[in-house]
Amino acid sequence: GSVQSLPNLVPNYNHPEPSPLGLEKAAAMIRAADKPILLVGLGTFWDNASSSMVSLAEHLGAPVLTTSKCKGAIIEDHPLRAGCIIGGLIERDLVSKSDLIVTIGLDAVELQPKGWPYPTKVLSIASHPSLDGLVACNEEVIGNLDSILKILRTIVPKGNDWGYDAAKDFRASVHKALDTPSTGLSPQHAVEIARTILPRDTIATCDAGASRLLVVQKWQCFAPRDFLTSNGLGSMGFAVPGALAARLAYPEKPVIAFTGDGGLLMAVADIQT
């Protein structure tokens, strides 16, 4: 018989070229800022822009907060890595100290669905226009994130490195806030022990639920896409099948799943088979 090719179902989406005017407006906002902060989302992975994002952060001396799904975009022992932003209170003090919020590939679905609490100016760098309205931006540059970040790196001056101490202080405050007393093995200590024992290239999966907020702050990730979690819709029962899939895709890497009783029982049949 004959073989017939089917049409490609994946759309061929090309990023628009960033406008020179948009780039100049973005650069002007960065030049005017003394304390910029980078809020980095999953779009950074889609455009393979992790390296250029870190390069810009180092050039500006700006602290970096990533969303849960974007852990590993900046290695988590980097001095400018502050932690994860969830849209809650834990990161509010750090973000409020900045005088310019630069969102990079940020999908507001990863944040809590409530009003944006910061009066600070926002510069959005995105691959497509932000239509959700949850994060109101003063300026937005649209295009390939890797290209935009590389261009901005060359046209803005070096920053004052305020982010090194700011990120360090934030990490210390998060550690203190999560280090609650326990008579036995606490969840946070279990995560810390796992991170100490397991190799640096371990892939971690994490279920939805309150425990996820702890894991995303305590577990350290050292490469893009080495931390997999169900965020946005936040469906439970993800961690175990996610870990099995990760192991099949990367049999040479160790994999760990962080889950609770509900998430485990929803997927326990996957372990049986």
Residue spans for each PLM region:
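Active-site diphosphate/adenylate-binding microenvironment
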Residues: 168-252
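Short alpha-helices
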Residues: 126-130, 134-158
